[in-house]
Amino acid sequence: MLAKLFRSAIIGAIVAGILLAIMPLLRSNTALFFRSHSIQSEDVPLSYNQDVRRAAPAVVNVYSRESSSENNGELNIRLLGSGVIMSEKGYVLTNNHVINNIAQLVISLQDGRVYEACVIGTDKLTDLAVVKVEAANLPVITINEKRTAHIGDVVLAIGNPYNLGQTVTQGIISATGRVGLSLMDGSGSGFGGRQNFLQTDASINHGNSGGALVNTLGELVGINTLTFDKGSGGETPEGIGFAIPVALATKVMGKLIRDGRVIRGYIGINGAQAEGLSPNSTLDGNKRLQGVIVMNVEPSGPADKGGMKKGDVLLTMNGKPAVSVIETMDQVTEIRPGTAVLVTIRRGDQEMTLSVTIQEFPES
C-alpha cells in the first residue's frame, strides 16, 4: 500500500515538473505569435501610395495668363482647373468649361515644368477639350481598355482644388450611366441629357475639373467634370460628383484631334425607354415589345422628314435593335451625316420601315 502511494507521489511530481518546465515556453510562444501578428499588420498598412505615384505625374494644372488693365498690363496667372496627359505627343484632355473663351493657356506639370498650350478642339456636349503642349519626356496616364468600372469600385480623384496644390481624394463608384445633370440642352434633339456619367463620392471641387479619376491600379477611369450642387430646400448635397467615362473621353479626344470638333449624326427625336407597356402592346401574345418611345419629333428634322411621329415605338435603327435611348442615340452619332438609314417602328398595331436621312448635329 505504501509502495503504491509512493509511486503515485513520484509520478505526480514528475508530471508537475514537466508542466512547470514547458508552461513558460508555451506562454512565450503564444505571446510571440500575437506579437508577430501585430507587427505584421502594422508593417503592411492599407495604402494607395504606389497607385497615386503611378498616375499623379500625368495630371496637370491648367492656368490662364491674362494681361491686367488695372496693373499696367502686368500678366495675371489664374487657376482654371486640371488636365490629364493622354499621349507622349503632348495631348492633354480637360473640360470644355475649364478652357472655354481663354486666350492664353499655361500647363504646369507635377515635376515643375511649365508650358504654353494651344487648343486643339472642344466639345460642349461632353464637356471635353483637347489642348497640346510641345514637350519631351511627358508622363502619360495608364489606360486599360479591357477594364470596366463597376459600382463599388474604389477610385481616387486627382486634381488641384482651389489651387492648393495637387490633391488626392478617395471614394467609390456610386453609380454608372447617370444622365441628365447640367449638360441637358433641352432642344428635344435626343441629345439633351444623353451623356453617360460615372457618379462618385470622391470629393470633386473647383480646380478638380478636368483631372483624373483613377482606380487602385492607377489606371484612368474617367475625367472629373462636375459636382452636383442643386439641392432642394437650400441644402448643399455632399459626396455627389461626376466623371466622364474613359471610353467616351478617348473616343471624343480622337475625333477632336482628327477634325478639331466632333461630327455627330442627328435624327431629331427625343425618346424614352419603352417600359411598362400594356399587355396588348406586344408583337405577339407572349413577347413584350422592346424599344424606344418617340416623345418628341423636331419639326423639319430628319425624323420628321422621314415620316416618324410622336408616339411611335422605335424598334431598330440601321439594322440594330433599339435597346435603350443612350445606345440608340450613340448609334446615331456614329452615322455619317447624309447617310440614309432604315428605321423600323411600331405605330399602333402596325409595324413599318421608314427611310431617314441622317443630318449633322446642329451646333448651338
Regions found by a protein language model. Name each.
Residues 1-33, 50, 118, 132, ...:
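C-terminal recognition in membrane/secretory proteostasis and scaffolding
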Residues 4, 79-83, 141-145, 198-214, ...:
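Gly/Ser-rich catalytic serine loop of serine hydrolases
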Residues 9, 40-50, 66-89, 106, ...:
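A conserved glycine-rich beta-strand in the N-terminal activation segment of trypsin-fold
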Residues 22-73, 82, 88-91, 104, ...:
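N-terminal activation segment of mature serine protease catalytic domains
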Residues 38, 87-167, 322-326, 331, ...:
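Conserved active-site neighborhood of the chymotrypsin/trypsin-like protease fold
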Residues 57-63, 83, 90, 94, ...:
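Terminal peptide-recognition signature
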Residues 67, 88, 103, 122-126, ...:
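Short, conserved beta-turn/loop elements at beta-strand boundaries and strand-helix junctions
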Residues 69-72, 76-77, 102-104, 138, ...:
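Active-site loop architecture of trypsin-fold serine endopeptidases
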